[in-house]
Amino acid sequence: MIDTASELIVPARRAFLSGTSKVALSAAAVLLLAGKDSLAQSMGGPMAADVGILNVALGLEYEAINAYQLGAQSGLLQKPVLDVAVKFQGDHKGHRDALIATIEKMGGKPVEEKKLDDYAKVLKADTLKSQADVLDLAARLEIGATNAYLGVIPTLKDAQLAKVAARLAADETMHWTVLNSALSRSLPSDALPFGA
C-alpha cells in the first residue's frame, strides 16, 4: 500500500492541485469545454496559458485512465468492482476527449499520453497487492482531480462557466464517494471536505 498521495504526484500536478501555479482557465476556455464554440470565439484574447492549464488537466485524466487500466489488468479486482472501475475509466476517457477537442479548438497541441509502463512506475503499481490497494490508489487520484477542478471555480465570474467546472468536479466526487464506500470508509467527519 502506498503511504501518501504526495508520493504519486509529479511537480506540475502538485502545483496545479495546490493552487501554487497561480493560473486559471479563461472564460473562453471553459466555454469551449462546454461546447459553446461560437460564444468562446467572440470573447477573443490569448489562450496560450489556458492551453497549458488544460494540458495539465489532460495529464490528470491520462493518469486516471491508466490507473484504472492497471487495476483492471492486475487481476486483483473482483467482478462487480471491476465493472465499476471500467465505468469510471470510461468517464475519464470522456473527460480526456473533451479536453483534447478544446485544446485543439484553441489552436493548441494536446499533451501526449505516456506508455502504460510509465504510469505503472509513477503510480507504483508493483506495490498493489489487493483489491483494497487498487481502490485506495483510485480514491486518492479521484480526490486530487476533484480538488483540481474545484480550484478553477473561484476564478470564474460567470455562473454558467462555473457550472461546467462544477460538473467535472461532481463527476470526480461521485467516483471518490463510491470508491470510499467500497473500501468501507466512513464519510468525512468535517463539513466542506472538498476543495481545501
Where are these regions (language model features)?
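All-alpha RGS (Regulator of G-protein Signaling) helical domain and cognate RGS-like helical scaffolds
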Residues: 2-9, 21-25, 31-196
